[in-house]
């Protein structure tokens, strides 16, 4: 929960229950970045540090409404085993590990891992705050394109509502 607290404003942080539900419903879609992956040091199980995560769920298809994009939504209502759309519900890296390419490399590695296991995927979806330029850069560099905007999707610590951009990447898989 330390990563969530250091990465997101209070009003859009997800609580422990949401993370536990994600782990229970789709454990293959919850991937962590350990300091071992960055420096060759011992991993979390040997005293290393968990410094990032990516949470996801499978959807039957790209949604036709905004409701599934809400913070803290019930994954058990949205998740569809064998679904063709991967929704990246949360992605974060501790601030001290940002700025040197770690986030982008981890994001790509996490998606590669999920894609390898989930052969039915045809698209990947996420929502990002319009003002989170570093995150948008990572997503754009990985082939995600803006689809539409959700007005007032994110609330800052200053109680200012900011728009979210839903982005999608179509997978072109070899048969």
How would you label these PLM feature ranges?
Residues 107, 114-130:
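Conserved GNAT acetyl-CoA-binding A-motif
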């Amino acid at each position: 929960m330390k990563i969530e607290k250091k990465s997101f404003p209070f009003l859009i942080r997800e609580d422990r229950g949401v993370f536990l539900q994600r782990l229970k419903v789709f454990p293959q879609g919850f991937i962590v970045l350990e300091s071992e992956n960055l420096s060759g040091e011992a991993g979390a199980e040997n005293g290393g540090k968990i410094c990032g995560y990516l949470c996801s769920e499978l959807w039957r298809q790209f949604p036709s409404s905004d409701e599934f994009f809400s913070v803290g939504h019930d994954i058990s209502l949205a998740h569809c085993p064998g679904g063709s759309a991967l929704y990246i519900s949360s992605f974060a890296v501790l601030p001290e590990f940002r700025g040197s390419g770690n986030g982008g490399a981890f994001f790509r590695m996490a998606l590669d891992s999920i894609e390898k296991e989930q052969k039915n995927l045809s698209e990947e979806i996420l929502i990002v705050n319009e003002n989170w330029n570093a995150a948008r850069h990572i997503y754009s560099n990985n082939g995600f394109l803006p689809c539409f905007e959700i007005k007032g999707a994110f609330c800052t610590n200053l109680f200012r509502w900011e728009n979210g951009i839903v982005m999608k990447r179509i997978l072109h898989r070899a048969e």
